[in-house]
Amino acid sequence: MAQLTALDAGFLKSRDPERHPGLAIGAVAVVNGAAPSYDQLKTVLTERIKSIPRCTQVLATEWIDYPGFDLTQHVRRVALPRPGDEAELFRAIALALERPLDPDRPLWECWIIEGLNGNRWAILIKIHHCMAGAMSAAHLLARLCDDADGSAFANNVDIKQIPPYGDARSWAETLWRMSVSIAGAVCTAAARAVSWPAVTSPAGPVTTRRRYQAVRVPRDAVDAVCHKFGVTANDVALAAITEGFRTVLLHRGQQPRADSLRTLEKTDGSSAMLPYLPVEYDDPVRRLRTVHNRSQQSGRRQPDSLSDYTPLMLCAKMIHALARLPQQGIVTLATSAPRPRHQLRLMGQKMDQVLPIPPTALQLSTGIAVLSYGDELVFGITADYDAASEMQQLVNGIELGMARLVALSDDSVLLFTKDRRKASSRALPSAARRGRPSVPTARARH
């Protein structure tokens, strides 16, 4: 038996009596080839699941083995209507997220989704966040693969850091350690709740219905932005997310302000920070620099995780306090992950895509997770169904934010910073400095 952490116990004591489904997180793999038969799938899952921690245990005052574990209670099978395109897949993912996990059984589900176009099928792994401290959804997915290598999603971001902007505390340490990220931020957020400004967010009342969408970006394009500006993939992703929410606010006729949106952002294995997204800036480079600087500053001053030192009952009370906060307190959760070390295969078939699924937990109405797989960086987005009428605006804004940064990362674009302008000024005669026109602050092409 394994002892619960303070965070696990806190969430257990604060469990939503209506079994709100938002505390589930997951990952979806799109697999090439025909879907296996139920008997084939059952044989493989039975063989591989029982060796994975937590998958045959239940959560009480500690993790205990579940008597009479039955795999069939955890496997669901659905078929997409024609044409079986991406939109239908996203609807199926949202449907799976709406179904709450049974707290009296092991806290995970596996959904087999058939009927994808191009002779493909998908497997969705959904777990409760309390399992994520020991086994993430992506790690669980990797353990189900043919090589059963739990290190497939190990830290291997492969982004070269350019001094002096390299940040050892990049938020890519693991994809789905969400129980620690969310709950650590929950405790911090509850303590700061009184000082939060009242803002209008692109979110409304939390419902049990969900929407899901994904945005894909070529990884080479992200790498080019990182090298051009000396930032991390985390910074690039958050800057694109910022453009997405700025687009939503402008679409609603609201003026983006410096205090419009907070984001829960992972900093290490045991803590989280709550910086504001700089939605007030229209200049994409200024947004990127601001995100980078705030990430570094927040990482340096972030204290040790409250979860390691908070009494169980106090942690539960803090979580309850956050649950009662106005919906606009926090509106987005940004997470990230390294790419798998190798191409994954399941039952002899290649995994073509892997999509991350963030939670919309408690009062976090919109979640955005980022995962790198193959040659793509994927933004997975979940939102309350009724509170996400502008989800397409959010998607469009993320795509626009990435497109603007990629265009600016081209080698033919010169960026003029204050240091560059000062150096240029010193190189000119004093008379020329007095008479020359001012240098534009944006960029010049040559």
From Swiss-Prot:
Q: Name one GO biological process term.
A: glycerol metabolic process
> What are the positions of the active site?
129
Name a GO CC annotation attached to this entry: plasma membrane
MF GO annotations:
diacylglycerol O-acyltransferase activity
Region Disordered, residue ranges = 425-446
Q: Its domain of life?
A: Bacteria
EC nos: 2.3.1.20
Keyword vocabulary terms for this entry: Acyltransferase, Glycerol metabolism, Lipid biosynthesis, Lipid metabolism, Transferase
Reactions catalysed according to its record:
an acyl-CoA + a 1,2-diacyl-sn-glycerol = a triacyl-sn-glycerol + CoA
Q: Where are the transmembrane segments?
A: none
Task: Read off the SUPFAM superfamilies from this record.
Answer: CoA-dependent acyltransferases
Cited Pfam families? WS_DGAT_C, WS_DGAT_cat
| Pathway where this protein functions | Glycerolipid metabolism; triacylglycerol biosynthesis
Q: Which family does it belong to?
A: Belongs to the long-chain O-acyltransferase family.
Protein name per Swiss-Prot or TrEMBL: Putative diacyglycerol O-acyltransferase MT3481
Species of the source: Mycobacterium tuberculosis (strain CDC 1551 / Oshkosh)
